[in-house]
Amino acid sequence: MADGVTLVDSTGLHSFSSSPSLSTSSSSLTAVALSLATSASAVTASYSISHLPPPPLPPVPTTMAGWIGWVFSFFFQVIPSVLYWVITFSTITLPTWLFTLFSMSLTFTMNFTTLLLIVLAMVSTISWFIRYRFLNMYSRLPPEPQRKEPQVDLFPDVQEGDSKPGLANYLDEFLSAIKVFGYLERPVFHELTRTMQTRKLIAGETLMLEEEKGFCLVVDGLVQIFVKSMRDGKSDTDEELHHLGAESSDEEHHIDGKQGYQLLTEVKNGASMSSLFSILSLFTEDIQLRENESSGSSSSSIALRAARVPNSIPTSPRGVMDSPSLGFQDHSDDTSNMITNGDLPSVPPLHLGESHTPPSGDQHHQQHHESRKHSSRKRRKSVHPDIVARAMVDTTIAIIPASAFRRLTRVYPRATAHIVQVILTRLQRVTFATAHSYLGLSNEVLGIEKQMTKFTTYDLPNNMRGAALDRLKDKFIKERDRLGSEEVTKGIALHNPSAGRRRRSSSFLRKDAALQVKMMTPRRAATVVTPESAPAEHDTYGVSPGDLLSTIQSSRFGPRYEQPPAKLQSPLAEKENTHFRLPAMQARHTFRRQDTMDEDALFRECILDCIMKGIGLTSSTRDALRKSSHSGDASPKLLSYDSRRQKAIFTNNAFGFIDPYEGSGDGETESLMSMSVTSAGGTSPVINLREELRNDIEIVYFPKGSVLVEQGERHPGLYYVIDGFLDVGVPIVEKGEDLVGVSKPAASKESFPTLKRTTTANSIGAGGTAANDSRRRKQSRKSLYLIKPGGIQGYVGAVASYRSYTDVVAKTDVYVGFLPRASLERIAERYPIALLTLAKRLTSILPRLLLHIDFALEWLQVNAGQVIYHQGDESDAIYLVLNGRLRSVLESPGNKLAVIGEYGQGESVGELEVMTESTRPATLHAIRDTELAKFPRSLFNSLAQEHPGITIQVSKLIAQRMRDLVERPVTEKGVERSNAGGVQTATSTVNLRTVGILPVTAGVPVVEFGNRLLHALHQVGVTNGVTSLNQAAILNHLGRHAFSKMGKLKLSQYLADLEEKYGMVLYIADTNVSSPWTQTCITQADCILLVGLAESSPSIGEYERFLLGMKTTARKELVLLHSERYCPPGLTRRWLKNRVWINGGHHHIQMAFRLTAEPSHPETKRFGTVLKQRVQVLQAEIQKYTSRRIRQTPLYSAQSPFKGDFHRLARRLCGRAVGLVLGGGGARGIAHVGVIKALEEAGIPVDIIGGTSIGSFIGALYARDADVVPMYGRAKKFAGRMGSMWRFALDLTYPTVSYTTGHEFNRGIFKTFGDSQIEDFWLEFYCNTTNISKSRPEYHSSGYVWRYVRASMSLAGLIPPICDEGSMLLDGGYIDNLTVDHMKGLGADVIFAVDVGSIDDNTPQVYGDSLSGFWSVFNRWNPFSSCPNPPTLSEIQARLAYVSSIDNLERAKNIPGCLYMRPPIDGYGTLEFGKFDEIYQVGYAFGKQFLEKLKTEGSLPLPEETEEKKKLQRTMAPRRASI
């Protein structure tokens, strides 16, 4: 019976027979039962044995003996029991259990159906696991929601004023008022304010501003400024104003009743009551308008003055010949006596009338008043006539008298010139720009330049005409015949052999001049002028042919160099021929070589001579200013200066101007206060400008029709017309002339920063489009006036650095002398009389209308973050941005802030609410320190009554503004509702003038980055050029005290001038984080670029903490520098996660850089250090070839110099970005791949990509690597997946929501993009979707790529909507299939829009008022039916879904800058992905043909030549074709 278990299979496996039968005898069954019982008992026995509890431990003893016994007991009793239990369990119990388990026999019975179901269940389980656990990785990605844009920074406005004590408040108001003078050094400030007076005006008291000879400002109170209406007729306003002043009660009633007076403006605390023109008149009272203005009476006055020379001054003919034609000179000799005693001379009133004998005592003042009254009949009585001020409340005003300005002109002439330069600049940027571009007063502004020609026209001498001019023309004619017509249009310049010597820096010239002064010291002893030798010397000077003016002046009386010198003895003749003298020996030497002088050089010298006289460098002004310097200071040192200058002036000063005007050798770094001190000894090195300027003169020939100056550009220099005529005119807009008869002032294509309306279009036309529009505009122009031979073109613009309001075209073949602007700047810097003369001429010819506008316009300085007005405030003024940047913020319920717009230099804000007298719709605050022109509503009302044309002009501007609001893209209207985050208004990227480059942390190569960006901006072509600033450049220009408390004023003025001069300024923060320069870079920036190394730690850097502490509201953008053109997935998100203040987007830039900067003082290298560095180099080389990143580098890159990352960033900053918009259309979107390849081959860069549906897929592929090759491969692979019917069939589901589950579609997109995020794309990218939960469009620029591309491609019914933060997203084409509006809002200037959507069937339907479905089916299959097939239910639903999309598409086609492309792909269906190659070739062929057509038409947006190249072509390129 022991063998009872043999019935079990020997292998121990279970038998699965279908019907086993076991037949045994009863004895055998008994034996089996007995054996089972035996086994059971054995098991029970073993179980009981193995589960016996271990023996109990002996009790714990309490004594030492007990402890020892207890230990022995433990070892001999417990341990053997444990060992016995372990052995029993392992040898008996465990084998018994195993034997019993394997001895059991089980039997299962099943049929085939059951077996098949089991197999299907197993397969289903495995497929479910693979599909939803392995292939479903895209649904298990960590959640990365779209990045929310930070709230607008709007810091609370600091209220200033009443909280300060009286004296501090008084000083603040006074300082804010005199800011109009620009930077004032301490001695200049004291000189200007030491004679200041204050007056108290009671409420209702009137003040005749015509009688107040000084600068008036309101310290405390409120003053209204009234102007006499011109409608009452022009009468003797002087007497009327005197009468009004005598009867204040009548005046009050007169003004209140609006009888003949109109309110101009209201002046509050800290504002000036004087206009800019009145300030200029105070500085320029002693300046002569034209040289020969008073020459008729000069001889008598010279003789009388010569008889009055006091004995204390050496009687030399110099004194006789220096006598001016100004009445001011009558008192200079008297005041020189006072200098010896140290007394301050009394400053008499000055005038520009005829010369007269100086009276004495009270008779002097009476005669002087009569003289002024007599001379005033020839010109305006006052610079501010018919202006009356009335105090509304008790008011305190401060008056700086005119005598302070006259004294300042004498003591600190260079400081005076600086102030005049500042005022002239503000005059152009405030008054002229407002009148010309905003109010449409072009005739008045352009008339100033026309009237200026009467002061600047000087004919060439007779001997330079006739045969000499014919010989000059012959040279040009021969050269013109030799060159082609294409080269001649650039102009032909006469060869100047001395031109090579002029290209030297000013520092070298200063050194040469100083060396020349030292070497000429022995010669001076021989040329000292004594009273005895003076007549002979002057004879020599009178006939010196090397003089700048002697040749011209002598030519008026015939060829003077042929006459004997003895004939030049009359004082008048001597005066006429002593304008600019050379040193005596040099004069004699040049006289001897007169006969051999080159004719071309003589032409240049004569042209320079006429230009000098034209800009005011004449003998009269020179002598007057020199004489005035005698009384310029009370210092006794100037007595020796007076005696020495009689000797030194001949050999040390080529022009004979007063020494305080010369200054020190380095005028850039010396302070203004040191000018008169440095020159007191007469030993300052003076550069002989004469030779320099003569070499700078170019004689250029321009054929008929050549453009010398384009409208809006900065004047290249002065053009002196030798022969021919120049036509000065303005372009006429093709849409029709304005009612005021001028060109459209708010034209968005004008390149100069004039006042214009804020539009979504950039102020600068990009590339070929701007050039093409410019060419079209030039076809129709309005001629204003002609410049005849002897005239100067560009006087006002070139001397004062204005931009041209006109263009200048050669009316005939014209020969001109050209003096570059740089030479004029040198003249203005060394001889301030040029600026003063310009200011005097401007004040003399100013129209009355411009004067009143200038009176009412208020110049404001606003600090960064300061609120100009709040939402809901009363609208009292229009604000024009002169310098800086403003932001308009809408405060919605719930304290949510939304940016409405940003306004840069030249733009205006507030017209709509001012004209409609409504409250402010939004809060306006300054992004950075800003200069504004405040245009009060009272001025507009006054101008509207006098000049209705102004009302028409502003009304047209408001109408255009309203039209822009109505036609604003849907995308911008829904900015605050969209969760796209990255959406910005179109104005936020337009008209950026300053860009700050700030490192995230120390060690970032910002200097190299800034230099590369500067180079890219130069190549892209920023209008008016671009420059960069770092701390070294500032210190070199302003000295080491540039960042001191006083130096900041000078620094701010210098930076404002740079921003006016250049189109863009880069501020590079190359100093440590706490330096003043870093703070300046932050406060001056419209946009801040935070530059970081992508591979370094993304933690917050110290510069960012400093930036946050500054509380700046400027735009902030993140720039990540990559050593290779690859961005790992998720890297950008880590950088942006903690930087909520990045509100302007981010950029990926490839730039090779050194991670560790080289030490300035490298230590001596040891052997170990060298070995370690060598190992690191080898590791880097090996890693370069073994890294996975090498496989991500681009495979294909077009050979285009403008496709670099820095060029892309440059285009974004200057508003010339190129956008690519790809529409949806299913398989037809494969044509996008071909179009993009055609763009690549044409060299057209793409900066921003936006797509819808299949366009978002193709666009994302291109934006990821900015490469065509990987895009082509991935797109073809995806098309293969989509073309598989098996995948579509396997994805079918019960159509409750859609026909498919969407899994295969998701898989195809996810396999293409992986876990990449939109932020990691190399190019900026967005896609649009339709949010059916909130019924709005959404634009996505962050988050996982596959999700939003999948959402943008989700066709309703075919694929289920994708869920995003609780909302359901569908295909973006339902609302907008071609997102040109949104692309324009992102700042793209040129947009390529590729439309591949299906064309709607617009066949007319005539099936009647009711329709039978059976007839519809029959009609569809009836080939003989003439009735069109009615649309099916699905077609009607589809058309209903795309209703709004069609409307947006039609509007997109008409957006300026949009190049609409429609490839011929109508024959392909939406799901025909299998025809990839065919559709691709169609798109490629169409793209090449379309771009070739644009290139032929000249409208292809390729980068055009830069502004510098244009200037070079116009002025310097002729040198290549020189004779």
UniProtKB/Swiss-Prot annotation:
It is found in: Endoplasmic reticulum membrane. SMART domains: cNMP. Residues 88-109 are lumenal. Residues 1220-1384 form the PNPLA domain. PROSITE patterns: CNMP_BINDING_3, PNPLA, UPF0028. Residues 1-66, 131-1523 are cytoplasmic. This is Lysophospholipase nte1. It comes from Neosartorya fischeri (strain ATCC 1020 / DSM 3700 / CBS 544.65 / FGSC A1164 / JCM 1740 / NRRL 181 / WB 181).
